């Protein structure tokens, strides 16, 4: 996400320092925040940000795959999940297994791009779940409330930025934010 730690220049405008480069980011700050807050990079407040991977599907209902259809503005729902082939579960590293209160962010699809929900383990009777390649998992550090990030990303101003940053001929994929 664009959000970065700015510093103020002599002109009282916000600047971002990235390595050796410093640039004015006044046009990128979506809205004013209280003086006691600061803009930060999403990577600075999360321990994991990763798109899911393409699964090998199976009719065996053992390990659900969280897809965009499981991720609605009304919340997370396991009922629409498909399942991965049980023999492929070992190809997933432990951090790819969903954890309670992970943010599920639809990262492709016209009309679904940017949609977000919060994963709840109590809504998954199967125990283990993984995300497919159209869902990005955002796992905030313990000091950050996932609900705060959810409401930030759900904000119409931020959703507009996400739509404007979409990529490809059909504007169906988020290349980057920021």
Please place each PLM-identified region on the residue numbering:
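Specificity-determining recognition surfaces
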Residues: 152-178
